[in-house]
């Protein structure tokens, strides 16, 4: 294993950690690491791995936003509620590093639903659905990252 491969492996590991602990953009970091490896390896297999990683990343991003969003809509959570959650998630990201993005989203959904529905009892089920949507989104992104990492490992052995 050469130095570039080891560094790329570490970057991929950091990217996977960044998906769970959102300090770094995990999936873009993993994708960029595979691009670095493919450009350094200069092999057909390397570029096939990069192409596959690109397709997987795009598919993962699509599913990461499409599936939880559909789930929220199915559960009766409106787009304005989702946008309120997104706005407070952005604020939370800067106010409370790492966990603020999650807390902000949940708080935004809760406050929006509370103002629409009037009571805590009516707003809380929507808030729980928002938590499930967050977990689904993170799960999809993590699975995508693991799939790209596995593809890269296969590529490393194929080019060795």
Where are these regions (language model features)?
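Interfacial segments of multi-pass membrane proteins
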Residues: 29-45, 88-93, 107-116
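Short amphipathic alpha-helical coupling elements at transmembrane boundaries
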Residues: 70-77, 121-129
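Alpha-helical transmembrane segments of multipass membrane proteins
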Residues: 13-19, 35-39, 58, 90-91, ...
């Amino acid at each position: 294993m050469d130095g570039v491969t080891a560094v790329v492996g570490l970057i991929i590991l950091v990217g996977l950690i960044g998906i769970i602990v959102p300090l770094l953009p995990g999936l873009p970091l993993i994708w960029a690491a595979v691009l670095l490896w493919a450009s350094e390896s200069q092999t057909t297999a390397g570029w096939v791995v990069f192409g596959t990683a690109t397709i997987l990343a795009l598919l993962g991003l699509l599913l990461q936003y499409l599936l939880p969003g559909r789930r929220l809509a199915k559960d009766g959570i409106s787009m304005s509620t989702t946008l309120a959650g997104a706005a407070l998630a952005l604020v939370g990201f800067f106010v409370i590093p790492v966990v603020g993005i999650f807390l902000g989203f949940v708080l935004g959904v809760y406050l929006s639903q509370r103002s629409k529905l009037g009571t805590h009892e009516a707003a809380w089920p929507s808030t729980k659905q928002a938590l499930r949507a967050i977990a689904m989104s993170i799960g999809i992104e993590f699975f995508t990252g693991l799939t790209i990492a596995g593809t890269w490992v296969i590529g490393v052995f194929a080019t060795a």
